[in-house]
Every structure is written in structure tokens, then in C-alpha cells.
Amino acid sequence: MRPERGYVLCDPCLGRLFGSGNILHCEKRGRIIRGKGRDRPSECHICKGLCPSLEESCGPSLWGAAAYEFETFVVGVRLKSSMAERDDEVRSRCRLAGAAALRAYVAAMLSSYLGAMTGASVDHGAPELSITADLRDNTAEFHPRPVVLSGRYTKSVRGLSQKGAPCGGCAGEGCTSCGMLGVDTGGSVEGVISGHACGTYSARRASFTWVGGEDQESLVGGRGRPFVAQLVQPHRRGLVHPATVRLGGVVLHGLREVRSMPQLPVRFRSKVRLAVSAKGEISDDTLGRLADLGGSTLAVYEGRRRVERAIHSASHSRTGPGSFELHMEVDGGVPFKRFVSGETVFPNLSDLLGTVCSCGGFDFEEITVERGGHPGARGGTRRRPRKGPARPAGGRDRPRKT
């Protein structure tokens, strides 16, 4: 029995079902199986003429890849259910369990086409661009892998909170007033960094992992506070950033792309300066008790949960009869205002000095991530990502970036 008896098959489907070898050579194998002197059918029982004209009919749907920069990609395929059912029927009836499926052939051919146009390679593990080609209406969906940025920031102005409030116009969904970011871009460190990073990478929005936090009125000095930002739907990647990026009162340091988000929790230490006021005057002897803080351990209570935080060093300087500055290096996660007032932190300044104390503010002089706990793994040297296939002259405009 000839392989195609009972079915009219095109060369690609014939070679795919009844040949073996590289899936990209199915059409050539189909011509060999069919034999010389035999005319090619005008229509195929399975694909209805799709496979012989795959590049012409489906290739244009991949032009949207031109809006992205990438070195690796993967193509998935959606077929008409009737087409997939006919393919399954033929493979079952002819007992071709090991033959390549139509979906796999189409994905391989489109991948070959896109790879030839861009020089990018297929990666089924963690591609920089995932494409779903929908052959039901010859469209395509593009899903770039998020870009993860690691860096530090210093803050030289007060009145700027760390985390941004959702945009009042869209409740965090994204609108024109917030640049589609979902947060107020000017009222917080998060908003300032989001605006810069998403603008640089043409990304949809950013989500952050912070190494500690500070009050709205706190300053952040030294080398800055580490952070990691994941950029969603980026159109660019593989960028090299300046050593410092000045964004008003916020300065970014050492911004770079890394492989992944950090393993939580991240262990770190903070050098902090606290402004403390007591209810009355404090004698020098009483202030001398602060020397006992260095090398001690704080017990911090959060509901029924007890957490210990070490104080590695402590020193003080008087600023008035009933006020002083306390300089400490402590483990991350100490609630400084509660440490001063005495609420659920033991020992605390109010108990230690025997008077009611309040914290007028605190600034960070340095934040150090403990060895092996840096947020994000450094990425290797990489080539500049290629863009998608160039759109032919006179083609449709690029999709608008959002």
C-alpha cells in the first residue's frame, strides 16, 4: 500500500509522517517518497495547503518580534482544532505513533524562519522571547522574559517614601497619567526608579525586592540601599548602565542586569544614626549606660513571634540636655522607633535610661549585605541582543509599546 493511499497529502506532511530525520527536511523527503513524475496535489487532507506556503502565510505574523531585543526564543503554535484532529486521525489509522506532529513541524519551521532572519537561537529552557503563533487567524503573541536589575540607591532628600502608592487615577492598573506604571512616579523611591527603568527598557512595569526599608523622612547614604527590580514586558535587554544615575534626590549606583530575583530572606547589616529625645534631662552617667548596647542582642516581638537581632556596635554624642544621637551597626530588621520608645523591643532605650524616650528620626549611613546574600546573581558577559526581523518597506507600523 502506498503511504498516502486513502489520503491526499502535501510533500511536507508526506515526509513528516512517513520519513525520518531532521524535521526541517520533511518537504524534501516528501518529494522523494512521492517519486519523480508525480504531480503535487493542489490541497492536503491534513493541513489544507498550510505547510507548503507556511513562510508566506504565517511569516508576517512574526514581524512583531522586531519590537523586541533578544538572543534566544521559542515558538509555540495554536492550530485549528479540525486540523489537529485530522493529523491525529491519519497518524492513528496508519499507526504512525513515532511520526512528528503537525504542531511540532510548524513550530520548527517558524523557528527556523525567525532564526534565519534574526540570528537568534531557539532555547526551550529560558528563552528571552516566547512567541505563540496562532494559525487560526495568523496572529502572534509575544512574551519577553522579565529583565532583573540589581543596584543600590542613595536618598539625599527627606519627604520621599520608599514604596510608591498606587496611582489615584487607575488604582494601580496603569494609565496615561502614571505612564502605565500603576504608581505615582514622583512621590516615592519606587516611583522614581520605576519611571527610569521602565523608560530605559520600554517595560510595562516593575516589581521590587528591597533590602530593608526606611521612613519617608530618612536619608540613605554610604554606598546606598541594595534593591532588585523585575521589569515586566521589556522590549530591550542587555544594556550597560553608567556607574551612577542621578534622578533628583535619588541616585542609583552600580545598576546591572542579573540572572534572577534573590533568594529570600536577604541577611544584611545597617549603620544607622538615630536622633533621640528624652522627657527630661539626662545625666552623663545615665548616658554612659548606652555603652552596654554594643554586642548585645535585641528581642523583637511581632505578635507571638520572637526574632533576635544583634547590635554589633554602638556609640553616642550629646546634642542637648535631654537629647543625643545614637550611632549603631545592627542586623537588618530592627524597628528603630519601637527600639527607642520601648514597644515590644527588649532591651530598649526608654528602659535602659529610665525615662520616656522618643525617636525624632533616623538616617542610614551604610547598608551591607552579608557574604553570599547579595540580591541577584551577576550575569555573564553577553552580546547585545538582536532585534526581530526587519519589517519590509511599506509594511504595517510596529505595535505601539505600552
UniProtKB/Swiss-Prot annotation:
The active site is at 215 (nucleophile). InterPro entries: Pus10, Pus10-like, Pus10-like_C, Pus10_THUMP_arc. It comes from the Archaea. It holds the Pfam family Pus10_C. Residues 380-389 have a biased composition (Basic residues). Gene3D superfamilies: 3.30.70.2510. GO terms for molecular function: tRNA binding; tRNA pseudouridine(55) synthase activity. Keywords: Isomerase, RNA-binding, tRNA processing. Residues 370-402 are annotated as: Disordered. One of its GO terms (biological process) is tRNA pseudouridine synthesis. Its EC number is 5.4.99.25. Transmembrane segments: none annotated. It is an enzyme of class 5 (isomerase). The keyword Hydrolase does not apply. The keyword Isomerase applies. It catalyses: uridine(54) in tRNA = pseudouridine(54) in tRNA; uridine(55) in tRNA = pseudouridine(55) in tRNA. Responsible for synthesis of pseudouridine from uracil-54 and uracil-55 in the psi GC loop of transfer RNAs. Belongs to the pseudouridine synthase Pus10 family. This is tRNA pseudouridine synthase Pus10. The gene is pus10.
